Regions:
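Short aromatic-glycine-(Arg/Gly/Cys) micro-motifs in beta-strand/loop hairpins
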Residues: 9-24
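Short, charged, surface-exposed hinge/linker loops at domain edges
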Residues: 1-5, 35, 39-70
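A short, exposed loop/beta-hairpin motif centered on an aromatic-Gly-Thr core
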Residues: 25-36
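Hydrophobic residues in alpha-helical membrane-spanning segments
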Residues: 23-26, 61-63
Length: 70
């Protein structure tokens, strides 16, 4: 798995954890727990990359995995 930065935070409005991947526009996931959200966002990263490659779009190189809790 590529090592992309993940920003994980709690959304009071939606009452779920949200994970965003800034290096992959639009790549995000949510879940009831931090663990479930991280599992979902890793799948979202895999699917984002697969879709980009399928359409011939560039896939950004990861800057290094870092988990930020906000």
């Amino acid at each position: 798995m590529q090592k992309y930065e993940i920003i994980l935070y709690w959304s009071d409005e939606d009452r779920v954890f949200v994970a965003e991947v800034p290096e992959l526009p639009g790549c995000m996931a949510h879940g009831a727990t931090q663990e479930a959200t991280l599992k979902s966002v890793n799948e979202a990263i895999r699917l984002w990359i697969h879709t980009a490659e399928e359409f011939g779009d560039p896939v950004p190189e990861p800057k290094g995995r870092r988990l930020m809790l906000a």
